[in-house]
Amino acid sequence: MKNKKKFVIFAHSGTYDKLYQIVTLAITAASMGRETYIFLFFWALRRFVNEEFDFKRLSSEFGSEGERLAKRMQEINPISLKEILQEVRGMGNLKIYACTAAVKIMELEESLVKSKVDDIL
């Protein structure tokens, strides 16, 4: 990943709508040939490490409106965020990093985090 334009995403929030935006921004930038970096903090880090990308959580995050959206998404049956991320990572120009302090603050197991990201910084 040298001599290419770079695209950096700093992700803090772990709500589905924010995770969706992170993934769509990453796939767009990577598809355009940019070196793409995602830096994970706090709830985004927790959801990523625990692979909690399910849109069904919308109902608990956004009440009745989230329930309606989750039902609609179930009907549409979109490709999962996890699958999209795997595809983007396969392109070779996406790196995902975890914040050292956030790993400790969120009480995440360091070995598990290391197995899900490119590095802990």
Predicted stretch roles:
Residues I9-Y20, F48-V49:
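Short, glycine-rich nucleotide/cofactor-binding loops
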Residues T36-F42, Y97-C99:
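Short internal beta-strands
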Residues K56-G90:
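A glycine-rich helix N-cap at a beta->alpha junction
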